[in-house]
């Protein structure tokens, strides 16, 4: 299961099991997969209808994927235009354009990108969001673009609890770091297994003489809070053991502190 949610009305908790940053949009050859943005729209509507007081986002088994899904979730938890996003620098190369042809069409101020240069990922004309966009009541299931929540009136106003483990890596850790640096919710669980600032998005190729498959990072991710760049790991607000064989200690903590 990539992701699924459950509403616990008695405890006034919505539990979102978020196992991988992947869906139908990131894997277009698998139309049977759900779309994360559609699931979020349904989830938030049900949360509002049932007046749920706490959203728990479980990332302890999430090793990453496409960071766009983290941006989708954050758009429901914090005003999009006031969110400070992780800085993403990307080096444009022939290999990048070969593997991701969209970069051939990307522009900055209507000028094409130059091979070999490093760019701010969010400075491209094509990656700037339309801040006038509102999610329609009856969203179209065959839309070709992700549906961000840009309506501040729909921002979730309850408690938000993220569960982190040593295995919460890559895009998962980026989401946790973005939430922390924007003051969204609290993090419980284990200290992260990687640096909040890191290289990512690996491009794979085959060496012509040896046929060895190699990978090269094309992006560097820098956290929002520059005062914390020295931190080697993301330490949770509340440290809770996750591998107790007898008890689910983190869930017990959540019920004790947020369950009705």
Regions flagged by a language model, labelled:
Residues 1-260:
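C-terminal "post-core" interaction segments
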